[in-house]
């Protein structure tokens, strides 16, 4: 077993610390000095499934392989769109990895 490609996907909407400071009693300096965070991506139209599928498609492209060549899909998230089918099985269907083993790991912070 090996990882042959990686991919990522972020929601389109970006909310900055200044955006937050405009609606609550805080500042960019206060947030960033305590957390290191300056911006965050907020999913408004995207779902966990759509983001995961886009990230997997990016990883497949990076690896130069087709979804049908995948043997195993493990999805790790506690914020799935639905309980059934699992996120991994939704990815499996989207990329055409019909013969792959697919399952989710839902372990929150302990994962």
Language model feature labels by segment:
Residues 45, 103-111:
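Active-site nucleophile and cofactor-binding loops and adjacent substrate-binding regions
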Residues 79-92:
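Short Gly/Thr/Asp-enriched flexible loops that form oxyanion-binding sites at enzyme active sites
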Residues 4-7, 76, 106:
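Short beta-strand segments
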Residues 53, 85, 109:
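Glycine-rich phosphate-binding loop at the start of an alpha helix
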Residues 71-77:
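Short glycine-rich or small-residue beta-strand-to-loop segments that form or flank ligand, phosphate
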Residues 1-71, 93-96:
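Conserved "HGTGT" condensation-loop signature of ketosynthase/thiolase-family condensing enzymes
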Residues 82-84, 98-102:
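Short, flexible active-site-proximal loops enriched in glycine and acidic residues
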Residues 40-41, 101-103:
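Structural signal for short hydrophobic segments within the conserved structured cores
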